[in-house]
Amino acid sequence: MFAIVRTGGKQYRVAAGDKIVVEKIAGEAGTTVSLEDVLLAGEGADLQPVKGLTVSAEIIAQAKAEKVIVFKKRRRHNYRRRNGHRQQHTILKIVSVGNAAA
């Protein structure tokens, strides 16, 4: 069974056993979280109602993405600024899709 869930402003297609990288979710590694914003669910070509459906996931790790460099320059004015940013994200392992784990 698969589901489309929304978290952190993005949508992910998940099934039991999948690992996904999402925007930061508060919690320690090993904690179980419930993703309740399920948009679509189904098995094969058959779709199922999503009312009350939840996806259970385990937090594997809290990590940071690679550094993104932001460089600003104004030519002929000796103006140069260099900033870096590392976005925080969470690695999740999907435990189950459906009401059984809720």
UniProtKB/Swiss-Prot annotation:
This protein binds to 23S rRNA in the presence of protein L20. NCBIfam families: L21. The gene is rplU. GO terms for cellular component: cytoplasm; ribonucleoprotein complex; ribosome. One of its GO terms (biological process) is translation. GO terms for molecular function: rRNA binding; structural constituent of ribosome. Belongs to the bacterial ribosomal protein bL21 family. Part of the 50S ribosomal subunit. Contacts protein L20. The keyword Ribonucleoprotein applies. Pfam families: Ribosomal_L21p. It comes from the Bacteria. Keywords: Ribonucleoprotein, Ribosomal protein, RNA-binding, rRNA-binding. This is Large ribosomal subunit protein bL21.
